[in-house]
């Protein structure tokens, strides 16, 4: 809504916590972006899922998709070449993944099953 500068009647996203077509803090968000020399952009659900998986895989952080959206924006900005050395970037992750377990269940890999045998366990984990 803010990026398009219009109210969105029926927003669609897997990030349910930010599925708001008319944000109550619209002016505050725009002011914060302006005062910090920042900007507000949008990301796709695919970009959110990429960041969501990366947080879990690389950092061990289980964030909800709405929180991962901020990192998705950083990744998008980086890939577009809009970040330069020395830039200060803040990505806030406030929501725990347990707020939205359905998305985690949909994208996680099936558990690995092995026999109750130390050699089978070593083989499964690659040691």
Please state what every model-predicted region is:
Residues 1-62, 106-127:
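Active-site/ligand-binding loops adjacent to catalytic centers
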Residues 18, 22-24, 47, 67-69, ...:
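Glycine-rich beta-alpha junction loops
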Residues 49-79, 87-89:
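Substrate-binding/catalytic subdomain of NAD(P)-dependent oxidoreductase enzymes
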Residues 72-127:
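Phosphate-binding loop/pocket of nucleotide- and phosphate-handling active sites
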């Amino acid at each position: 809504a803010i990026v398009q500068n219009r109210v969105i009647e029926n927003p669609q996203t897997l990030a349910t916590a930010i599925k708001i077509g008319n944000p109550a803090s619209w002016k505050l968000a725009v002011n914060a972006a302006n005062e910090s020399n920042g900007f507000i952009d949008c990301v796709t659900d695919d970009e959110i899922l990429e960041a969501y998986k990366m947080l879990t895989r690389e950092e061990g952080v289980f964030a909800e998709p709405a929180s991962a959206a901020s990192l998705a924006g950083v990744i998008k900005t980086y890939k577009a070449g809009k970040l330069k050395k020395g830039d200060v970037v803040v990505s806030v992750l406030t929501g725990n993944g347990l707020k939205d377990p359905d998305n985690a269940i949909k994208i996680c890999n099936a558990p690995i099953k092995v026999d109750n045998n130390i050699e089978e366990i070593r083989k499964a984990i690659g040691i």
